[in-house]
């Protein structure tokens, strides 16, 4: 019988687990271990900075076996981007070789190194309407049990309590399960590119 999953605030002691879950879900929801030569880089881009820069909106999901997922967010995407650029990314860049901007020359985790040296632009959406953003990833043992819905309820409530009128998420177009999950929760497509679909929903009544 599956053990109960609890939601708790993430701490600095969870950084290793944040990186682990990020890696194990980093290939459009699947395990990315076989393609990465640095198992921590995904987490250092997409997970750990939330515990450092937006700790009130960084949570882990935990069962009897340990951390089995996370829910992370920021109520103001522009402010969080400022934190990344001014505080988080500079020391990472100093310790990582720049692979150059040509994807044809990349190997292993070079795509992640490039994202650290040349972060992608914010999606072209109305950030006044959807200023908050979030990430949620669950290991397989936590999926299909209503845990994802409970986690999103928790994150959405935290962001709404902080005054965010709406939130958006970036989803891989190769992850139809996630896209269906967000559509079921009332998210609508805001924009789409070859690499991602951005979905959003209002959190507060206008």
Curated annotation (Swiss-Prot):
<feature type="binding site">
    <location>
        <begin position="175"/>
        <end position="177"/>
    </location>
    <ligand>
        <name>acetyl-CoA</name>
    </ligand>
</feature>
<dbReference type="Pfam" id="PF00583">
    <property type="entry name" value="Acetyltransf_1"/>
</dbReference>
<feature type="binding site">
    <location>
        <position position="184"/>
    </location>
    <ligand>
        <name>acetyl-CoA</name>
    </ligand>
</feature>
<comment type="similarity">
    <text>Belongs to the acetyltransferase family.</text>
</comment>
<protein>
    <recommendedName>
        <fullName>Putative acetyltransferase OgpAT</fullName>
        <ecNumber>2.3.-.-</ecNumber>
    </recommendedName>
</protein>
<dbReference type="InterPro" id="IPR000182">
    <property type="entry name" value="GNAT_dom"/>
</dbReference>
<feature type="domain" description="N-acetyltransferase">
    <location>
        <begin position="5"/>
        <end position="205"/>
    </location>
</feature>
<feature type="binding site">
    <location>
        <begin position="135"/>
        <end position="138"/>
    </location>
    <ligand>
        <name>acetyl-CoA</name>
    </ligand>
</feature>
<dbReference type="InterPro" id="IPR016181">
    <property type="entry name" value="Acyl_CoA_acyltransferase"/>
</dbReference>
<feature type="binding site">
    <location>
        <begin position="144"/>
        <end position="148"/>
    </location>
    <ligand>
        <name>acetyl-CoA</name>
    </ligand>
</feature>
<comment type="function">
    <text>Binds acetyl-CoA, but not butyryl-CoA or decanoyl-CoA. May have acetyltransferase activity.</text>
</comment>
<dbReference type="InterPro" id="IPR051822">
    <property type="entry name" value="Glycosyl_Hydrolase_84"/>
</dbReference>
<dbReference type="GO" id="GO:0016747">
    <property type="term" value="F:acyltransferase activity, transferring groups other than amino-acyl groups"/>
</dbReference>
<comment type="subunit">
    <text>Monomer.</text>
</comment>
<keyword id="KW-0808">Transferase</keyword>
């Amino acid at each position: 019988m599956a053990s109960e999953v609890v939601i708790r605030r993430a701490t600095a002691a969870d950084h290793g687990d944040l990186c682990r879950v990020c890696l194990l879900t980093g290939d459009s929801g699947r395990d990315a271990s076989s393609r990465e030569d640095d198992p921590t880089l995904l987490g250092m881009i997409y997970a750990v900075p939330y515990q450092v820069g937006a700790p009130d909106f960084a949570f882990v999901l935990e069962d009897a076996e340990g951390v089995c997922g996370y829910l992370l967010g920021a109520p103001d995407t522009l402010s969080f981007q400022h934190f990344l650029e001014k505080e988080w990314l500079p020391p990472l860049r100093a310790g990582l070789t720049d692979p150059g901007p040509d994807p044809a020359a990349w190997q292993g985790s070079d795509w992640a190194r490039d994202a650290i040296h040349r972060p992608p632009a914010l999606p072209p959406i109305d950030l006044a309407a959807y200023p908050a953003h979030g990430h949620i990833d669950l290991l397989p043992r936590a999926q299909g049990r209503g845990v994802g819905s409970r986690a999103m309820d928790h994150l959405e409530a935290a962001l709404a309590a902080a005054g965010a009128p709406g939130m958006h998420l970036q989803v891989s177009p190769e992850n139809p399960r996630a896209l269906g999950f967000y559509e079921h929760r009332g998210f609508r497509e805001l924009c789409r590119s070859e690499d991602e679909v951005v979905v959003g929903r209002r959190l507060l009544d206008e």
